[in-house]
């Protein structure tokens, strides 16, 4: 942030984002786009600006650890818990899922609109998580942060620089805009797409059991390993896969 005060913002380019032509300094504006008709009010007003796209996230207090190990009793309780179609989905989580689905219906048109308006860049908020898991500088920068549903396809590639910001950084910008305080930010986004297609691989393994009474039974366990630019290694489901293998 350059004005009204100088500050370092925690941001990172989203997958398949375009690059800026070196450092870009521009005025920051926010938009509220719920449907395609909302685009009309911004025509001719966004050129050369850095656009905040997305709601401000709440930063809840964190009063306990984000991770913990289940006790034997808790594991027994989970094993006996009746499984329902909505198991584990809280009303808050379902509301976020519904909002995300609605946003995805117009996301390609929004991306094309920003490109046509020649915006300098787009800043999106990192998605939040339960119990403050998306705060403290944590960035969720995977396919869910991408401005578009299929930007990995060449003709659908994002044509403007897009970054995802930590919710604290995004919230500061958002509140200043709401208070009608002019904000200027400098961004320098440098990205590179390594090829039109990267291969994925499947790994299949058989682990024989040791209980002769169960020798005719087969247990299938599956998982996926994704590497995303915001982290190192199998940041998506790596831990879950190891737990499944251990079990």
What residue ranges belong to the model's regions?
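Noncatalytic luminal/extracellular "stalk/propeptide" segments of secretory-pathway proteins
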Residues: 1-88, 148
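Protein/peptide-recognition domains central to ubiquitin and immune signaling
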Residues: 1-15, 101, 111, 119-150, ...
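Second-shell loop/turn segments in exported
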Residues: 15, 26-32, 41, 63-82, ...
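Soluble metallo-hydrolase cores and metallopeptidase-like ectodomains found primarily
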Residues: 16-40, 147-233
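Extracytoplasmic/secreted cell-surface and envelope-processing proteins
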Residues: 38-39, 59-64, 130-139, 229-231
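Loop/turn elements at helix/coil->beta-strand transitions in domains of secreted/extracellular proteins
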Residues: 46-51, 117-121, 183, 215-219
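Surface-exposed loop and adjacent secondary-structure segments within mature catalytic domains
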Residues: 65-80, 124-166, 178, 196-198
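Active-site alpha-helical elements of protease catalytic centers
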Residues: 234-247
